[in-house]
Amino acid sequence: MPRLILASTSPWRRALLEKLTIPFECAAPDVDETPMPGEAPRQLVLRLAQAKAQSLAARFPNHLIIGSDQICVLDGEITGKPLTEEKARQQLAKASGNIVTFYTGLALYNSASGHLQTEVEPFDVHFRHLSEAEIDDYVRKEHPLHCAGSFKSEGLGIALFERLEGRDPNTLIGLPLIALCQMLRREEMNPLNA
């Protein structure tokens, strides 16, 4: 049976995959994540997830390789990682009272057979109306500078929301486990009896 590789260095994706109790290794994919001109959010995350998984095929020739990529969209615009506190406050002010959609692309590539499975999972985050003081307090307490959308739903960020809508809450953190389990079963790797 092929071994499992997570094409990511994200500690959040690693922690999510550990929930399945299947042994795996992590490896950093070498992929240019620059969007193509006019590329739609769904197309972008699908292309990048697939590229991440396939980029490791030569290094891991008899493996199941998981690639994942996520973007955040608000008012039709891709919202990246803020990197500064000021940008985080701006992103949260814009999200206040609005719906932010996350698109997570998932790819599972069997490097032995060349079989590729892909999926894009949307997830909507309904923000409640936030005061400037709440935004300042949140950014100061959680420091979400390396998180798309400027929040961590697995932490204090949950206090920013009115409600969440999506098939799998793990999608919001970066790895849609329900879809991944379906893909793994198609490759004869059932997490329940692995």
Curated annotation (Swiss-Prot):
Q: Where is this site: Important for substrate specificity?
A: W12, Q70, E154
Query: Any idea which residues are catalytic in this one?
Result: D69
Tell me its EC number(s), please: 3.6.1.-
Q: Where in the cell is it found?
A: Cytoplasm
Q: What is one Gene Ontology biological process annotated in the Swiss-Prot or TrEMBL record?
A: nucleotide metabolic process
Q: Which cofactor does it need?
A: a divalent metal cation
Q: Which reaction does it catalyse?
A: N(7)-methyl-GTP + H2O = N(7)-methyl-GMP + diphosphate + H(+)
- InterPro entries from the UniProt entry: ITPase-like_fam, Maf-like
For this UniProt entry, the molecular function terms from Gene Ontology, in alphabetical order, are: nucleoside triphosphate diphosphatase activity
Keywords associated with the record = Cytoplasm, Hydrolase, Nucleotide metabolism
> A GO CC term?
cytoplasm
Cytoplasm recorded as keyword? yes
Q: Does the keyword Manganese apply?
A: no
* PANTHER family for the chain: 7-METHYL-GTP PYROPHOSPHATASE (PTHR43213:SF10), BIFUNCTIONAL DTTP/UTP PYROPHOSPHATASE/METHYLTRANSFERASE PROTEIN-RELATED (PTHR43213)
Functional summary from the UniProt entry: Nucleoside triphosphate pyrophosphatase that hydrolyzes 7-methyl-GTP (m(7)GTP). May have a dual role in cell division arrest and in preventing the incorporation of modified nucleotides into cellular nucleic acids.
Q: Which family does it belong to?
A: Belongs to the Maf family. YceF subfamily.
Record protein name field? 7-methyl-GTP pyrophosphatase
State the organism of origin: Salmonella paratyphi A (strain ATCC 9150 / SARB42)
